């Protein structure tokens, strides 16, 4: 039986742990540095069908129905008014029990960890990693040690374990924007479609709103281009950058606000150990403009599990090359979206809106731009 150590109890780490748990050839232990698993209960996520299909392998299709939502469209709006530019029918990519899904991150985490409680050890932070004859020895700050055959690192964008493995201080880079999120409880006068995804494109900013369950709760995320500052007056920033463009948006930001600087990965790393692998944000963190963060975490976990279970030769290189190819595909689209969502020149905005009307109805374009991502696995 092979021993597998998984560092980080996030989406990718918990998902691959579920896959290993269903295979008697592996013994898993999940380590997390926090005292409790971070649920981030107010945080909504989107899952495209490439990840929903994989989650169904661990019975996500039986997930409590009122705690998730299946939007059918993305509605595009400009900053000038509440009039819709066009919409994109994402349900065209759906099939049977595999549909574009939105939900709270905390609900997905609870689903992923419900059968793993006996395999999770919290308050474990790695201080040292050694290898001897293909066995990796982990030493934690509490002086506990653990020997494993495979080490899977999924402790997020600020992965401390990656720095220990590579023996260098590896940090993500600030991408020049700030993310703000809040939860909205829909009312009769809510100006947008509460059953679908709304994308409001502004000058140097954009807002995404989508339902996260069948209880009329919506997640709002606002991305604003902003130089890095340690202290920011959120209300003043929103008033200056958002409300100045459209006062109709004021009622969207009345609830509790949370914010964080957006970091992305400078470049992916191939682990120095042949039996150690990076997953999720520890491998690569995308700009949040393609809604593929969670889906790519799930996809990469399934990809790695498949390669390991098939005893693939030259495993490290095969996995890294597959992930690198996938990253480039998603990242190119994320960067293009980031640029096009934030246009400020009136002529460019007019041209973008015209193209959106055409492209969102072009089957050939959508199959290339989205289908290559949504339908890969």
Stretches with model-predicted labels:
Residues 36-54:
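Conserved N-terminal glycine-rich FAD pyrophosphate-binding loop of Rossmann-like flavoproteins
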Residues 353-377:
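C-terminal auxiliary extensions adjacent to catalytic cores
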Residues 84-100, 104-109, 185-259:
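Conserved FAD/dinucleotide-binding core of flavoprotein oxidoreductases
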């Amino acid at each position: 039986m092979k021993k597998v150590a998984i560092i980080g109890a996030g989406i990718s780490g918990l998902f691959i742990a579920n896959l290993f748990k269903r295979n008697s050839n592996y013994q898993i232990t999940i380590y997390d540095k926090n005292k409790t698993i971070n649920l981030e209960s107010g945080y909504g996520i989107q899952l495209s069908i490439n990840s929903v299909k994989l989650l169904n392998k661990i019975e996500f299709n039986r997930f409590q129905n009122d705690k998730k939502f299946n939007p059918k469209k993305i509605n595009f709006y400009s900053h000038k008014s509440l009039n819709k530019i066009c919409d994109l029918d994402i349900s065209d990519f759906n099939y049977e029990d595999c549909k574009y899904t939105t939900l709270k991150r905390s609900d997905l985490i609870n689903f992923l960890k419900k059968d793993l409680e006996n395999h999770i050890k919290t308050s474990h932070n790695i201080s040292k990693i050694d290898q001897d004859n293909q066995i990796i020895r982990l030493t934690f700050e509490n002086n506990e040690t653990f020997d494993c055959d495979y080490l899977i690192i999924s402790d997020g964008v600020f992965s401390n374990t990656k720095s220990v493995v590579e023996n260098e201080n590896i940090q993500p880079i600030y991408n020049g924007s700030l993310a703000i999120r809040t939860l909205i409880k829909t009312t009769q006068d809510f100006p947008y479609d509460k059953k679908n995804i709304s994308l409001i494109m502004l000058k140097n900013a954009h807002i995404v709103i989508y339902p996260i369950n069948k209880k009329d709760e919506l997640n709002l995320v606002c991305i604003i281009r902003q130089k890095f500052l340690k202290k920011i007056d959120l209300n003043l920033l929103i008033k200056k950058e958002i409300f100045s463009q459209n006062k109709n948006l004021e009622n969207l930001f009345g609830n509790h606000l949370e914010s964080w600087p957006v970091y992305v990965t400078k470049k992916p790393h191939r682990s120095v150990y042949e039996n150690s692998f990076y997953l999720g944000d520890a491998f690569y963190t995308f700009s949040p403009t393609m809604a593929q963060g969670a889906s790519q975490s799930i996809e990469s976990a399934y990809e790695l599990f498949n390669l390991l279970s098939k005893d693939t030769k030259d495993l490290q290189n095969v996995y890294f090359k597959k992930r690198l190819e996938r990253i480039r595909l998603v990242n190119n689209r994320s960067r293009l979206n980031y640029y096009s969502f934030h246009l400020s020149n009136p002529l460019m905005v007019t041209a973008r809106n015209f193209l959106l009307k055409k492209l969102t109805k072009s089957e050939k374009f959508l199959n290339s731009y989205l289908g290559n991502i949504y339908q890969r696995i």
